[in-house]
Amino acid sequence: MALRFGNALFEPLWRRESIANIQITLAEQLGVGTRGAFYDGTGALRDMIQNHALQLLTMIAMEPPASNDADAIRDEKLKVLRALKPFTRESVARDVVRGQYRAGMCGGHPVPGYLEEVKVPPDSACETFVALRTEVQNWRWAGVPFYLRTGKRLAARDAQIVVNFRPVPHQIFPGASLPNRLVIKLQPEDGLELQLLAHKGTGPGEQLTPVSLDLDFDKAFATQRVGAYERLLLDAIAGRLNLFVRSDEQEQAWRWVEPILDAWAEDGNGPRAYAAGSWGPAAASALVARDGFAWAEEQ
C-alpha cells in the first residue's frame, strides 16, 4: 500500500502496458509437523491461496482508494476479487497445479514425505503445493497473467511479490535481454529490490549488465520492524481495520476458489509428487513457461 500510493514513481507504470506478469510466492521449508490431522482436512489452497495470496493480489492490483479509510480500501480490494477470471473444470486442469511433497533433503537435512508425517492417512490426496495462473479482467490488467504459488517443504522460506516489467520496445544495446524487475520482499527479509540494466564502464563495448538496487527496511530505519502478527495485534488494539478482511471479501474469495475444489473432487489423478527441498512439481514451471516466462529463481 505505501509503495503504491505513497510514491508517484510507480503509478504510471502500474498497468498492462508496462507490466508483463506478476508472481506471488509464499514458500515454506517446514512440513506439516504435528498438525497432520488438521492440515489433511485443509490443504494449501484453503490454507494459503484463499486468504494470504489473494489478499496480496488485491493490494497489488487494486485501484487507488479515495482515502486511507478501511472501507475505502476494502471496497477496492473487493472489486479486484470480483474481476478475477473465474475457473471452469477445463481451466482448472490447464491453469492449476497441485502437488504433494515426498521424502527429500530440506535445509541440509533428510525429511519424510507428507504421507509419512504424523496423523496423515497413507492414501491422502491432500495438496501441500499449489501454483496457478489467473487474470484480473479490467482495463488496468487485461491480459496480464498473475501467478500464485505456495507450498510446504520447498527449497527456501520465501514470501515475495515479483513484478516483471515488459522489455523496452526497441533495444539499441547488444545482448540486453533481461527486462526490469521489482521484487517486494516480505519474508524472511522485509525490503525492496529493483533490478536494472547498466553499463559497467570497465572496457570497450556497450554490453549491459544486470544490477540491483536493494533496500533492507531494518537497515534503512536502523531498527527491526514490527512483525506481521504483531502489526495486526497493534491494529486490532487501536481499532484500525485497514488490514482486516471484510465479510464480503471473504465470501468472494471463497466463490473464486470453490470451482477448483469441485474440480479436484472429481479428478482421480490426485496431486503431483515433488521432492522435499525442490520448488515443487515440474508442471509448475511449465505453467509459467507456457506464456514465455519463468519463475524468478529460474531466470
Where are these regions (language model features)?
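Secretory/organelle targeting and membrane-embedding segments
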Residues: 1-299
